[in-house]
Amino acid sequence: MQSEAQSPRSSQICSTEPVFGGHQPRRVSHAVDVRWGGQLVTIGGDAPVRVQSMTNTDTADAIGTAIQIKELANAGSELVRITVNTPEAAAAVPAIREQLDRMGVTVPLVGDFHYNGHLLLRDYPGCAEALSKYRINPGNVGQGAKRDTQFALMIEAAAKYDKAVRIGVNWGSLDQDLLARMMDENGARAQPWGAQSVMYEALIQSAIGSAERAVELGLGRDRIVLSCKVSGVQDLIAVYRELGRRCGFALHLGLTEAGMGSKGIVASTAALGVLLQEGIGDTIRISLTPEPGAPRTGEVIVGQEILQTMGLRSFAPMVIACPGCGRTTSTLFQELAMQIQTYLREQMPVWRKEYPGVEKMNVAVMGCIVNGPGESKHANIGISLPGSGENPAAPVFIDGEKVKTLRGERIAEEFQQIVSDYVARNYGRTEALN
């Protein structure tokens, strides 16, 4: 018979306070400044993990592209990437920047170049100047002897105009000359690596080798960001762990072609969550395929929510809501939770400027008496709506104290006003701080 000292129950009792660790410290990296006018976004170093996005408009449509960039910036995107693939697109970039400046949108723009970037940056100096950062893909910057020359031309443009670059490797467009050479070298090994390991190594060598070549050409390490994008969760984790171990460059995280809807969100969250928890990653982009007619801003919100739920940054007040069960026969709490979440998101462009700190606020919308009062007390503001068979009243808690009870048909409107009043009362306007 098992003694008390050996029982599972007693072994779970700690005599000393256990160490409950959170995410690991951020990996040390070079800080890369990306600027436009007075707007400075630093990637890496001790800067917060940045959220960026990409337009899906025809860049040659300057007005349409500027409108979408403004939407992404208003949603909280700190950098916005645009495709620069044709002379028409390159010619439109200065007009896009001018439109944004007139609208008061100072978000830095990143030019996404493939195949012909060396020509576009040379032939359209206005484009080269209007962009704040260039994305270069080593896999398609040129083939054979042309590759080094064309890569050098892009790096020289970045140095000339003092622009940051992202050297972005993608396994769908990996440098085939490099991969073939590495496959041959692997075949000559006494104990050849698996094909997957060779692929990982090729991605990493392409990124780091290209970055070191850029440094040789005169670009500072504090002007370079690296990425090695793949579409598999475990592949991304494996590649970035090794990439992060082997270099000090700032790293851009993203699962390429993550997919649509919940699948894309889950895949991106699973991959980035592991890496961010380990302190790897300085900027993220969530590559979601939007549903027809859906706003492009969804990828920004998902990126923000990943960082916020992990406790790495705060972007908007968090709404805590129960999932519902047999005790919550009414849909009122679901509708209220959705309404409050939408309201908070809509207010953030103004609140972010006027009420610093509001992004850390928590609001609880609960559906019955089981967890409702408790969760509501833990939040800054909480409401516990009545469940099935309960008294048709909704107690409201502010900073842990019950302050009033709402009844009737206007619970949603009254609670929204309570939230608004709380924000105005507890988060000082910026002009009052100056």
From Swiss-Prot:
Binding-site positions, [4Fe-4S] cluster: 322, 325, 368, 375
Protein name: 4-hydroxy-3-methylbut-2-en-1-yl diphosphate synthase (flavodoxin)
Catalytically driven reaction(s): (2E)-4-hydroxy-3-methylbut-2-enyl diphosphate + oxidized [flavodoxin] + H2O + 2 H(+) = 2-C-methyl-D-erythritol 2,4-cyclic diphosphate + reduced [flavodoxin]
4Fe-4S listed as a keyword: yes
Entry EC number(s): 1.17.7.3
Function text: Converts 2C-methyl-D-erythritol 2,4-cyclodiphosphate (ME-2,4cPP) into 1-hydroxy-2-methyl-2-(E)-butenyl 4-diphosphate.
Start and end residues of each stretch annotated as Disordered: 1-24
GO BP annotation list: isopentenyl diphosphate biosynthetic process, methylerythritol 4-phosphate pathway; terpenoid biosynthetic process
Organism name: Burkholderia ambifaria (strain MC40-6)
Family matches, as Gene3D superfamilies: Dihydropteroate synthase-like, Sulfite Reductase Hemoprotein, domain 1
MF GO annotations: 4 iron, 4 sulfur cluster binding; 4-hydroxy-3-methylbut-2-en-1-yl diphosphate synthase activity (ferredoxin); 4-hydroxy-3-methylbut-2-enyl-diphosphate synthase activity (flavodoxin); iron ion binding
Pfam family, one: GcpE
Cofactor stoichiometry and binding remark: Binds 1 [4Fe-4S] cluster.
Keywords attached to this entry: 4Fe-4S, Iron, Iron-sulfur, Isoprene biosynthesis, Metal-binding, Oxidoreductase
Biased composition (Polar residues): 1-15
